[in-house]
Swiss-Prot record:
Compartments it resides in: Microsome; Endoplasmic reticulum
Protein name: Heme oxygenase 2
GO molecular function, one term: metal ion binding
Superkingdom of the organism of origin: Eukaryota
PANTHER family given in the database record: HEME OXYGENASE, HEME OXYGENASE 2
Main location: other
Name of the coding gene: HMOX2
Residues bearing PTM Phosphoserine: 2
Disulfide bonds: none
Biased composition (Basic and acidic residues): 13-27
Annotated Gene3D superfamilies: Heme oxygenase-like
A single GO cellular-component term on record: endoplasmic reticulum
Post-translational modification, as annotated: S-nitrosylated by BLVRB.
Length: 316
């Protein structure tokens, strides 16, 4: 009997040790910055995943003009990010993650801007208002809290290496862009031979940063702020779209141009059988008028650009 008790106790003790070692290993793994970011931004991912803008992008429901404006927003965003990365390339909390040859996107985006807007593209564009807050935040972090810069770099570049490749194919197919890469240079990482291996290297470097738990928590918080900026931009997009639609109607923009058979208008064709024509306005004409508004174009651009960033997270 006593021998059985001792054996049982011995097994129990061994199990306790194994359980303790496993728990410690899990705690260490969960303390890795990459794991903390993954777990700590799940809720933000879920909110973004249900955004109609994101769903439409995946379906290829994008217009070339909006894609051009999205490229504009990306150009200003990455210009700010890479300026601050250059400023902090020797900072101990960021230096191991400084990969200008492999990751930097400004030069690629410059090529895309030239493709879409021509050689004098710099005279034609300005930083979209909707993207300005995020640009300002990046500059603030780079100049005042560089230890948090990793939140923005990791969110952007790791996503670009993942879902960005899916977005490239969607854009090329939907917009009939050249398969040789014109207009989508942003998604081409010429100096990264194996994206999966590079992402593993980047995460390992990030996890090896000498950061205490409080700083890691602040980095996760900063990553969530980036997602919040995205959500705010989508909300602004919806509000601006509604406001400008009202302005268009108040300005007396014609509901239908009166040329040809009115029944061929997709809106009227769908509503005719319902007896709902009276008092209705055609959203297709309204949408075209709204999209001609420069202010809304830039809001849509920022929304498209940040949607691309959100989508990229889904494939990491």
């Amino acid at each position: 009997m006593s021998a059985e008790v001792e054996t049982s106790e011995g097994v129990d003790e061994s199990e306790k040790k194994n359980s303790g070692a496993l728990e410690k290993e899990n705690q260490m793994r969960m303390a890795d910055l990459s794991e903390l970011l993954k777990e700590g931004t799940k809720e933000a991912h879920d909110r973004a995943e249900n955004t109609q803008f994101v769903k439409d992008f995946l379906k290829g429901n994008i217009k070339k003009e909006l894609f051009k404006l999205a490229t504009t927003a990306l150009y200003f965003t990455y210009s700010a990010l890479e300026e601050e990365m250059e400023r902090n390339k020797d900072h101990p909390t960021f230096a191991p993650l400084y990969f200008p040859m492999e990751l930097h996107r400004k030069e690629a985006l410059t090529k895309d801007m030239e493709y879409f807007f021509g050689e004098n593209w710099e005279e034609q564009v300005q930083c979209p208002k909707a993207a300005k807050k995020y640009v300002e935040r990046i500059h603030y972090i780079g100049q005042n809290e560089p230890e948090l810069l990793v939140a923005h770099a990791y969110t952007r570049y790791m996503g670009d290496l993942s879902g960005g490749q899916v977005l490239k194919k969607v854009a090329q197919r939907a917009l009939k862009l050249p398969s040789t890469g014109e207009g989508t240079q942003f998604y081409l990482f010429e100096n990264v031979d194996n994206a999966q291996q590079f992402k593993q290297l980047y995460r390992a470097r990030m996890n090896a940063l000498d950061l205490n738990m409080k700083t890691k928590e602040r980095i996760v918080e900063e990553a969530n702020k980036a997602f919040e900026y995205n959500m705010q931009i989508f909300n602004e997009l919806d509000q601006a779209g509604s406001t400008l639609a009202r302005e268009t109607l108040e300005d007396g923009f014609p509901v239908h141009d009166g040329k040809g058979d009115m029944r061929k208008c997709p809106f009227y064709a769908g509503e005719q059988d319902k007896g709902a024509l009276e008092g209705s306005s055609c959203p297709f004409r309204t949408a075209m008028a709204v999209l001609r508004k420069p202010s809304l174009q830039f809001i849509l651009a920022a929304g498209m650009a940040l949607a691309a960033g959100l989508l990229a997270w889904y494939y990491m």
